[in-house]
């Protein structure tokens, strides 16, 4: 087996990044990178194996290497509170000031653009990524191809692959819709890629390659696995975090019965980093969908917990079993008060799991504190109580492998929406909209543009059919007559 396919040797994102970069790769260049000596030695061996491969073999192995990389940036990577440096002044731990964050993002953007440029220039990479010049040149060629009276084969290929739409005076290159006006996939040039990847990465809680690809492939036609990996190699927060085992709060799936209607309730202790009067967090998880709810608590008294649970139950519905690792006495008291306050509700306590409780509670606490740290740093705030709802949304919209969908989809039956940024309108158009009237105008322009493209496509299809008929060498006299039966029919 080639050395670069051994999982232990592809654990460093630096190795993958250098292998994907064109040009000579010497051991000297590695000392420019933050890697260990063992990694540098591994890279030298990997490079030797890599150079022996043909171009087609490299393409074949590339996907395998990218799959191995999935473990390098774990899904939902979050920086642990304990790993954040202490800062001087009034900034809380883990909260960078705005100027430092802007400088870091600027450096990331510059490095990403350089890496993408090298990737595109690599002869072994069949690029879907446009330079800015190529992007606008393609728009021009697509428009010219549609306007030509007599079209070449290249014109037909262009028209079959791309469409151009105009919204508020801005022309955008999109994937040919073929009549599917409810699904638009945009093409972007490399100068636009970083902001799209960065915003998506943050919005899904520093999610890995698979989650980012799931988020982006529905709206963009040329955001590839390779460019996502290049971006992820630059995210310091993801690589500073030590991979931790996934916690298993939810029991193993069983055939459906009432016991499946279970919720998990934990009280997480935040007294060491209290946010004003809030010193605890209520962690709620639905067993079957893994949907979570986070709420700040002033105390861990049962009556305060019950008040929050009633809000949850009257919105999402009530489970049959309430499970908790916060103690049998606490669980029984909460269940008793729920049944007292809501006589029509009948809910029972979950089974006690000796030996498992502490690990499960610690897992939930670690997960939430990691999310809090990331949110505090991104928002320059130490008021974690205000951010719990946003952290909850990030976790619930993340793709879950065991569910094969996000917890939000499992709970509600559709994907989470974020206002107009979930619409088919271009991002830059959405950013300028202020009123419903402006939204209606933009949607009408998009609709009209799609209708025009659909009519043009129908005309091009008719022209292509006519051209095929003109090129048909079969004489008209040889066409079979229907009166001669089926024996004279020709098969095409």
From Swiss-Prot:
Cite the KRAB domain residue spans from the record: 36-117
PROSITE patterns reported in the protein's UniProt record: INTEGRASE (PS50994)
Q: Does the keyword Chaperone apply?
A: no
Question: Looking at the keywords, is Coiled coil present?
Answer: yes
Q: Cite the entry's keywords alphabetically.
A: Coiled coil, Phosphoprotein
Q: Which Gene3D superfamilies match?
A: Ribonuclease H-like superfamily/Ribonuclease H (3.30.420.10)
Region annotated Disordered sits at 455-492
Extract one GO BP annotation from the record.
Answer: regulation of DNA-templated transcription
Cite a single Pfam family from the UniProt record.
KRAB
Where are the annotated coiled coils located? 427-457
Give start and end of each Integrase catalytic domain. Answer: 247-415
Task: Identify residues that carry Phosphothreonine.
Answer: 117
Q: Which residues carry this modification: Phosphoserine?
A: 115
The molecular function terms of the Gene Ontology recorded here are:
nucleic acid binding
Against SUPFAM superfamilies, the record matches this protein to: KRAB domain (Kruppel-associated box), Ribonuclease H-like
Q: What PANTHER family does UniProt report for this protein, alphabetically? A: PROTEIN CBG26694 (PTHR37984), PROTEIN NYNRIN-LIKE (PTHR37984:SF5)
The protein's name is KRAB-A domain-containing protein 2
- Species of the source: Homo sapiens
Organism ancestry: Eukaryota, Metazoa, Chordata, Craniata, Vertebrata
């Amino acid at each position: 087996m080639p050395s670069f396919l051994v999982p232990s040797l592809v654990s460093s994102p630096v190795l993958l990044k250098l292998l994907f970069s064109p040009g000579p790769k010497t051991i000297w260049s590695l000392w420019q990178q933050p890697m260990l000596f063992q990694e540098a030695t591994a890279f030298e061996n990997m490079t030797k194996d890599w150079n022996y491969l043909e171009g087609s073999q490299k393409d074949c192995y590339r996907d395998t290497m990218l799959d191995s990389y999935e473990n390098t940036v774990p899904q939902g990577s979050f920086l642990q509170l304990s790993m954040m440096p202490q800062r001087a002044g009034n900034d809380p731990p883990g909260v960078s000031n705005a100027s430092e964050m802007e400088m870091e993002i600027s450096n990331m953007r510059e490095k990403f653009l350089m890496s993408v440029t090298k990737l595109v220039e690599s002869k072994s990479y069949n690029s879907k990524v446009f330079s800015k010049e190529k992007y606008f040149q393609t728009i021009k060629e697509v428009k010219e191809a549609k306007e030509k009276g007599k079209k070449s084969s290249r014109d037909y290929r262009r028209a079959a692959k791309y469409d151009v739409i105009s919204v508020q005076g801005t022309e955008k290159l999109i994937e040919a819709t073929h009549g599917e006006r409810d699904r638009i996939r945009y093409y972007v040039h490399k100068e636009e890629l970083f902001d799209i990847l960065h915003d998506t990465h943050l919005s899904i809680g520093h999610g890995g390659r698979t989650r980012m690809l799931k988020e982006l492939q529905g709206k963009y036609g040329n955001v590839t696995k390779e460019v996502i990996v290049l971006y992820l190699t630059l995210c310091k927060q993801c690589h500073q975090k030590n991979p931790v085992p996934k916690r298993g709060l939810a029991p193993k799936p069983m055939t459906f019965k009432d016991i499946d209607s279970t919720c998990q309730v934990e009280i997480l202790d935040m007294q060491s980093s209290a946010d004003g009067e809030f010193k605890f967090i209520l962690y709620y998880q639905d067993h079957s969908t893994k949907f979570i709810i986070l709420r700040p608590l002033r105390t861990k008294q049962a009556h305060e917990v019950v008040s929050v649970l009633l809000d949850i139950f009257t919105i999402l519905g009530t489970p049959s079993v309430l499970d908790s690792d916060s103690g049998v006495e606490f669980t029984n008291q909460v269940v008793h008060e729920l049944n007292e306050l809501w006589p029509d509700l009948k809910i029972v306590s979950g089974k006690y799991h000796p030996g498992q409780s502490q690990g499960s509670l610690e897992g939930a606490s670690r997960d939430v504190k990691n999310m809090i740290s990331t949110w505090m740093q991104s928002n320059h705030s130490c008021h974690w109580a205000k951010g719990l709802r946003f952290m909850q949304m990030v976790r619930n919209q993340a793709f879950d492998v065991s569910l094969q969908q996000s917890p939000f989809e499992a709970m509600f039956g559709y994907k989470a929406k974020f206002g107009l940024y979930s619409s088919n309108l271009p991002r830059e158009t959405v950013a300028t909209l202020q009123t419903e009237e402006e939204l209606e105008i933009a949607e009408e322009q998009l609709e009209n543009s799609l209708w025009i493209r659909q009519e043009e496509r129908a005309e091009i299809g008719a022209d292509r059919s006519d051209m095929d008929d003109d090129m048909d060498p079969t004489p008209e006299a040889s066409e079979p007559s229907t009166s001669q039966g089926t024996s004279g029919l020709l098969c095409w």
